[in-house]
């Protein structure tokens, strides 16, 4: 297992961070969710992700939008989806970052997500047997997600 660090450096006195290492979710879904929650207040991001899990609000798919249907209630971008599994994992990650901020003595009421990104992790090799003695690759892509929250002044 290789050592994975954060992609950016921030002031540890005013920020708290958390990382989910090699989780089994879609890399494309994580990228779109991280883009959407970046810059949000922590409480608003948690509410937003809970609404995505409940399928009340959708996540706009900007880069991976091929064959993605339009959503009526979404403003600003037509295509979107409801990535429930990835939203659940990122919501857990935000709760961990909030707990880290409370442990450091920071005020969590006015925290904002200043950095969120996803990176490719390992690929677990797998095969699926096919007819006539052939086989198809059936791999599992893992994702590393990192979140940094900071105080708003």
Swiss-Prot record:
Keywords, alphabetical: Ribonucleoprotein, Ribosomal protein, RNA-binding, rRNA-binding
GO cellular component, one term: cytosolic large ribosomal subunit
GO molecular function per UniProt: rRNA binding; structural constituent of ribosome
Annotated GO biological process: cytoplasmic translation
Matching SUPFAM superfamilies: Ribosomal protein L22
Keyword Signal carried by entry: no
InterPro entries given in the database record: Ribosomal_uL22, Ribosomal_uL22_euk/arc, Ribosomal_uL22_sf
Quaternary structure annotation from Swiss-Prot or TrEMBL: Part of the 50S ribosomal subunit.
Function: This protein binds specifically to 23S rRNA. It makes multiple contacts with different domains of the 23S rRNA in the assembled 50S subunit and ribosome.
Family stated for the protein in its record: Belongs to the universal ribosomal protein uL22 family.
Name of the protein in question: Large ribosomal subunit protein uL22
Source organism (scientific name): Methanocella arvoryzae (strain DSM 22066 / NBRC 105507 / MRE50)
């Amino acid at each position: 297992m290789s050592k994975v660090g954060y992609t950016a450096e921030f002031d540890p006195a005013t920020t708290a961070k958390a990382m989910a290492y090699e989780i089994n979710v879609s890399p494309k879904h994580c990228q779109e969710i991280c883009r959407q929650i970046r810059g949000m207040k922590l409480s608003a991001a948690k509410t937003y992700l809970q609404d995505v899990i409940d399928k009340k609000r959708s996540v706009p798919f900007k880069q991976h939008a091929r064959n993605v249907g339009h959503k009526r209630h979404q403003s600003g971008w037509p295509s979107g989806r409801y990535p429930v599994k990835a939203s659940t994992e990122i919501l857990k990650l935000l709760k961990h970052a909030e707990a880290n901020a409370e442990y450091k003595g920071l005020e969590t009421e006015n925290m904002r997500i200043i950095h969120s990104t996803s990176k490719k992790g390992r690929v677990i090799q797998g095969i699926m047997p096919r007819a006539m003695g052939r086989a198809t690759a059936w791999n599992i892509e893992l994702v590393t997600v990192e979140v940094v929250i900071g105080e708003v002044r």
